[in-house]
């Protein structure tokens, strides 16, 4: 048997996908002409395995590893988002002159639900990648008044996990989350910025609700008949789903 050891440098996604995560060492630029080596074998052995709360992530990483892991480790920055609405919003926002510098960087876009975005935090922290998570506040759907909303809780695991770390509250009320977002220029922990609906988004649970509420200058808690929504949609030539009537 040969005792030879060696290494291969690559930018190939396929090479990365066909290697074990513990075999990877990532070189990332930290300053002009200066790189830092990130050892993913140590990441698994020293960050994930010793932490009882993170041990289940080993199976998760094995699953997402073959999908978008290469996009993350090669990226300058990462944007994690929930669905098609966020994707289209990001795509159009990046066309603005304001974000010209971002267009010249390698940004990885990862579609992931609010329940799972938190799973990416350890690897993003370890690789020190500046990241943005766009997710929905998702307070309980039975909250029908402003008072109900501010007393409600978020069902979003990612928001709750960030709040637990930053605010030391495992189940913060929506009012607490509103204040957290309102009192900071950016809700961020280390290198990760977290974006969700705030008090200025008209009590919306989701990005779609916030956009419609702003468009029609209304609260997301306001009600309209199906006919009124149909008329608005037709007049504005927009495409959005109007819920069917609920049988009593």
Task: Walk through the language-model features, giving the residues of each.
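Short, structured coil segments at secondary-structure junctions
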Residues: 2, 19-20, 127
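H-loop/switch region of ABC-family ATPase nucleotide-binding domains
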Residues: 9-11
